[in-house]
């Protein structure tokens, strides 16, 4: 009986070139592309491959973080509908959810917020690096450059197997990217940099750095 149930979770493919039948396992509405490799016209044939430009109907990975159904307008983070999060959670609460898998408790949110706001400043050499970009450089290109340069200031980030180290790198990115984005924007406008103000909340600080 169990074998019969398992066999139903499969796709039977007939290769009309050879007349052979193949049984391809189906899991969660998907088949593995490598399972098609067994379909050959001869022993020295490479095997069947899929051709799907732009991954229009190909799942590249399994995600426990995000579910998207664009046709139905569905977006979920960690199982929560995005509409619910937009109504009830702050930006940093959603960021914590994405990173840790659960919405934070009050104590966890306090620590998360404190840690991020503590790390909002960037090294002065990053500013010197930013000054090397032309006045008309696109802000996204500048942001890509200075964000990549952060790795040279934190060699400890290479220790990816240490959970505490992974946490502090997440905190640094969350803290410094708004600062870098604002600096890139102001550089492109020829404006002086507005440094972080940690008496403001996360979004307020970013808006202040951008437009003050």
Q: Model segments located where?
A:
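N-terminal mitochondrial targeting presequence
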Residues: 1-3
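Hydrophobic alpha-helical bundle cores within soluble ligand-binding/oligomerization subdomains
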Residues: 5-212
């Amino acid at each position: 009986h169990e074998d019969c149930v398992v066999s139903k979770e499969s796709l039977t493919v007939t290769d009309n070139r050879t007349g052979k039948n193949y049984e391809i396992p189906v899991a969660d509405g998907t088949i593995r592309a490598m399972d098609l490799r067994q379909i050959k016209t001869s022993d020295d044939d490479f095997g069947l491959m899929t051709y799907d430009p732009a991954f229009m109907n190909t799942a590249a990975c399994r995600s426990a973080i995000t579910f998207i159904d664009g046709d139905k307008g569905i977006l979920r983070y960690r199982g929560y509908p995005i509409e619910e999060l937009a109504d009830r959670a702050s930006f940093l609460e959603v960021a914590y959810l994405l990173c840790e898998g659960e919405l934070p408790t009050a104590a966890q949110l306090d620590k998360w917020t404190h840690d991020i706001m503590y790390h909002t400043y960037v090294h002065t050499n990053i500013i010197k690096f930013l000054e090397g970009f032309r006045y008309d450089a696109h802000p996204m290109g500048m942001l890509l450059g200075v964000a990549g340069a952060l790795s040279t200031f934190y060699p400890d980030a290479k220790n990816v197997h240490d959970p505490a180290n992974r946490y502090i790198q997440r905190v640094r990115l969350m803290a410094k990217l708004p600062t870098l984005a604002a600096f890139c924007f102001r550089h492109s406008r020829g404006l002086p940099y507005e440094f972080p103000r940690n008496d403001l909340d996360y979004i307020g600080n970013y808006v202040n750095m951008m437009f003050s």
